[in-house]
UniProtKB/Swiss-Prot annotation:
This is Exodeoxyribonuclease 7 large subunit. CDD domains: ExoVII_LU_OBF. GO terms for biological process: DNA catabolic process. It comes from Clostridium kluyveri (strain ATCC 8527 / DSM 555 / NBRC 12016 / NCIMB 10680 / K1). It catalyses: Exonucleolytic cleavage in either 5'- to 3'- or 3'- to 5'-direction to yield nucleoside 5'-phosphates. It is an enzyme of class 3 (hydrolase). The gene is xseA.
Length: 400
C-alpha cells in the first residue's frame, strides 16, 4: 500500500481543517478552572482551563474580552463558549473563546482567600508595620532561582542603574515542594548579615500552582518578622500572592523590584549636582540680596547722615540769618527814615527853638504855660524860661 509523504505544514493544515469542520468542536461549551492567566498588552487574554486530570490552552481576543463584565484570574472557575482549532505555525490546538461567565471559585483560590483573611486579622498586612525601603542601599540580598529569568533581569537592571551595588544571590527553589522553606532560610541568612540593607524575593510569571509556595503561611510570618525590609517581585503585574501583602513593598515584576531597590548612580549624581546648583544659586541670591540691601542702607545713611543733616541745617540757618539781617536792616532803615522825618517835624515845631530868637516862655508854679495877660492877675510868682536858663520873678504889676 502506497503511503504519501506529507510535510509538517500539510499535516497541520489537515488537522486544522478536520477540527474546524467538526460539528461539536466548532461550537462547544467548556467548564474548568483558570490557570496561568495572562492579560496581554494587546488586549488579548491567554490562559489554561483545567480539571483534575487535564488542561487545555485557551485564547480570547480583544473583541471578545471587551464584552466581559468581570475580570477572570487564576483559580476562578468559568464556563467558556468557543471553538477548537489548531495554531498551524506551532502545531498546537487550543480553545478560541468567544464568551465567558463565572462558575464559582477553584479550590486553590478559596484556600488563598481563606489564608488572606486569617493573616489580615492577625495584623500581618498592617501598613504601620511596614519598614521603610532604604533609598541608597549598597548591599542587597536576592532570594530567587539561580537559573531563572528573574535573577538575570535583576542583575541586568542593577548593572544598568548602579554597577557599584553589591548583589548577594541566595539560590532557592521558587516553586514546588520545599520552595517556601528555602525562601525562609534565605530570609534568615540575610537577616544575620549586618551589612545587607535590603532583601528582594523574586520569581518570574507562572500559573497559580507554580506560584503557590508564595502563599505559604510560614513564609508570610518569616517575611513579617524580618528585621530587614523586603521587596517582593513575584510573577507578572496581575499576579498577587500572600507575601505581596505582607512584604514592605510589592513590585509587579522582578525587574521592577530591582528598579525600586537599586538607586540609579546617574540619578544620584544628578541629584547632587542639582543640590549643588540650588545651593550655589541660593547663596548667590542671598549675597546679591545682602549687597542690594547694604547699598540701600548706605544710600539711606548718606541721605539721613547726622553730619549731612547738621550741615544742611547750618546752611538753612545761614540763609535764615542772612534773610533776618536783610529784613532787620530794611526795618531799621525804614524806622530811621521815619524817625528822621518825625525828628525834623518835631524840630520844626519845637517851642524851644523860638528861644534862640530872643523869645521866652512864662510858666506858673505848676509848670502851666501862661499865654494870656488875664492869667497873670491870679499868679504872684512865675518862671521865665529863656534859651540859656530859667528865672523866677514875683509879679508886681501887669498892664493889659
Amino acid at each position: 500500500m502506497y503511503i504519501k509523504t506529507l510535510t509538517v505544514s500539510d499535516i497541520n493544515r489537515y488537522i486544522k481543517k478536520t477540527l474546524d469542520n467538526d460539528f461539536i468542536l466548532g461550537n462547544c461549551s467548556v467548564k474548568g478552572e483558570v490557570s496561568n492567566f495572562k492579560f496581554h498588552s494587546s488586549g488579548h487574554m491567554y490562559f489554561s482551563l483545567k480539571d483534575k486530570f487535564s488542561k487545555i490552552n485557551c485564547i480570547m481576543f480583544k473583541s471578545s474580552v471587551e464584552k466581559l463584565n468581570f475580570m477572570p484570574g487564576d483559580g476562578m472557575k468559568v464556563i467558556v463558549k468557543g471553538r477548537i482549532s489548531l495554531y498551524e505555525k506551532e502545531g498546537v490546538y487550543q480553545l478560541y473563546c468567544s464568551e465567558m461567565k463565572p462558575d464559582g471559585m477553584g479550590e486553590l483560590y478559596l484556600a488563598f482567600e481563606k489564608l488572606k483573611i486569617e493573616l489580615e486579622k492577625k495584623g500581618l498586612f498592617d501598613i504601620s508595620h511596614k519598614k521603610k525601603i532604604p533609598l541608597y542601599a549598597k548591599k542587597i540580598g536576592v532570594i530567587t532561582s539561580p537559573t531563572g529569568a528573574a535573577v538575570k533581569d535583576i542583575i541586568n537592571v542593577t548593572r544598568r542603574r548602579n554597577k557599584k551595588i553589591e548583589l548577594l544571590i541566595y539560590p532557592s527553589l521558587v516553586q514546588g515542594t520545599g520552595a517556601s522553606d528555602n525562601i525562609i532560610k534565605g530570609i534568615e541568612t540575610f537577616n544575620s548579615m549586618e551589612d545587607v540593607e535590603l532583601i528582594i524575593i523574586a520569581r518570574g510569571g507562572g500559573s497559580i500552582e507554580e506560584l503557590w509556595c508564595f502563599n505559604d503561611e510560614k513564609l508570610a510570618e518569616a517575611v513579617y518578622s524580618s528585621k530587614k525590609p523586603i521587596i517582593t517581585g513575584v510573577g507578572h503585574e496581575i499576579d498577587y500572592t500572600i507575601v505581596d501583602f505582607v512584604s514592605d513593598m510589592r513590585a509587579p515584576t522582578p525587574s521592577a523590584a530591582a528598579e525600586i531597590g537599586v538607586f540609579s548612580l546617574e540619578e544620584y549624581v544628578q541629584k547632587i549636582l542639582n543640590y549643588k546648583n540650588k545651593l550655589y544659586n541660593s547663596v548667590k541670591n542671598t549675597v546679591n540680596d545682602k549687597k542690594n540691601r547694604l547699598a540701600f542702607v548706605k544710600k539711606t545713611l548718606e541721605v539721613n547722615n547726622p553730619l549731612t543733616y547738621i550741615a544742611n541745617e547750618y546752611e538753612n540757618i545761614d540763609k535764615i540769618k542772612e534773610s533776618l539781617n536783610f529784613k532787620i536792616k530794611v526795618i531799621i532803615n525804614g524806622k530811621k527814615e521815619k524817625l528822621g522825618k518825625i525828628n525834623a517835624l518835631l524840630s520844626a515845631h519845637n517851642p524851644l527853638n523860638i528861644l534862640n530868637k530872643g523869645y521866652c516862655i512864662i510858666e506858673d508854679e505848676q509848670k502851666n504855660v501862661i499865654s494870656s495877660i488875664e492869667e497873670l492877675n491870679k499868679k504872684y510868682k512865675v518862671d521865665i524860661i529863656m534859651k540859656d536858663g530859667t528865672s523866677k520873678v514875683e509879679l508886681i504889676h501887669y498892664k493889659k
